[in-house]
Amino acid sequence: MKRIFLLSVIFLCFLACRKSDSVVEPVQNNIRLGAVLDLSGDYSQEGLTGKAAIELAIESLNARYASVGSPVRFSCVYADTHMDTNLTKSGVKEMYDAGIRLLVGGPGNSTELKAVKPFLDANRMLAITCFSSSPSLSVADDYIYRLITDDNVQAGALAAMVLHDSVRAVIPLFRDDTYGRGLVTAMVEQSRGKNFIVNPGISFKPGSTNYQELTARTAGLVAEAAAAYGASKVAVLLVTYQEASEFLSAAQGNEILGKARWYGCDANVQKESVLTNTGAAEFASAVRFIAPIMGIGTAGMIPAPAAELSDLIRAKTGYIPDAYALSAYDAVQICGLAYDIAGSADAGKIRTVVPSVCSAYNYLGISRKLNAAGDLATANYIFWRVRAEGLGFIWDSYATYMAEGNYIVLK
């Protein structure tokens, strides 16, 4: 109830700020949103938690309208993409043909978003997303807003941890796609003028399954770097999606890789697949595998609204949502507030007011202020590690990268 009351206050404040126009548009009472997510594929944990966040946000949004006697109601149509760009494109096209012009949450990654961006821009279809972070999609004045920071910030967090750990050489093992190339390029930029290098590393095509071969090749690069800097000064940077568990499992028993440090990326954090693969979990725990993701709060403190929402999503899905899935909740709420101010469901009109809504919006404990490219301006990053607990393994918060100040705070 407190959650609904707080958002109701925000809702009424935005209504009070609504401009009075000389021409009044017909009221559209049934606003349909669209969400393109992986709901049954290899990366469905993210999609299912994002969907649950969207559903909870719509329940809250509709409760607010009901509380003030408004007939307006929001709903959402979903497309299951399996992270396949062809399915993503067809899903967006079908939504457009059905009259939907507002997308929330998805697409589920940067490669998918890149695939549909031309269609979104050409057809004035607005996407308020929270799962894409590639810097190559940081484009001003398009029809995409991203409620998460781009990977230049994530690279800054990783670089700060590399320096904190006194690592001298980073060996990327990464997806050869929009996301993987973008994050590695950002890491190379972060290394300039700092006391570490980023090796060209080993790339692999999405869908590759030759994990042992790729891991062995990575071990060769680690051995070369260790000869120059010492084994404790070398780190592997894993930039993967669901493949993380397979690579970690393949590395188990490799003496060279067992002596290196291991970092991951935001797409690895809190994934059950790493915990349920015994070999992966054992290796990750042994080498202190840590991975950062945009944080809501810090490693030691999650704001109450975010913690409450996380519990609700976990009850619905069985998964602990990450900060990106939680952000799907805000995507819906921001869309609703923008609709109230614009007085219209027209995507172009909503697009013009989203930045001002985001500048004032901070419900979960994270500012949603956007930069000139329409991405989240800044945020802390929380590093997570895998550790043993009882008879199994868990993800546990480890440290916080404080973006304002560019430093690491251990939990």
Set out the residue ranges of the language-model regions.
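Bacterial Sec-dependent N-terminal signal peptides
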Residues: V9, F14-I31
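Beta-alpha junction/loop-to-helix N-cap segments that form part of ligand/metal-binding clefts
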Residues: R32, Q45-A52, R64-V139, R146-L147, ...
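Extracytoplasmic "Venus flytrap"
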Residues: G34-E55, A79-T85, D176, G180, ...
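Periplasmic-binding protein-like
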Residues: A35, M95-G108, I128-C130, I171-F174, ...
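Short, solvent-exposed amphipathic alpha-helices that sit
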Residues: E46-R64, L87, Q154, T178-I197, ...
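Extracellular/periplasmic Venus flytrap/periplasmic-binding protein
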Residues: S134-S136, D141-G253, G300-A304
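Extracellular/periplasmic periplasmic-binding protein-like sensory domains
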Residues: A251-Y329, N406
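Segments of small-molecule ligand-sensing domains
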Residues: L312-L326, G336-W395
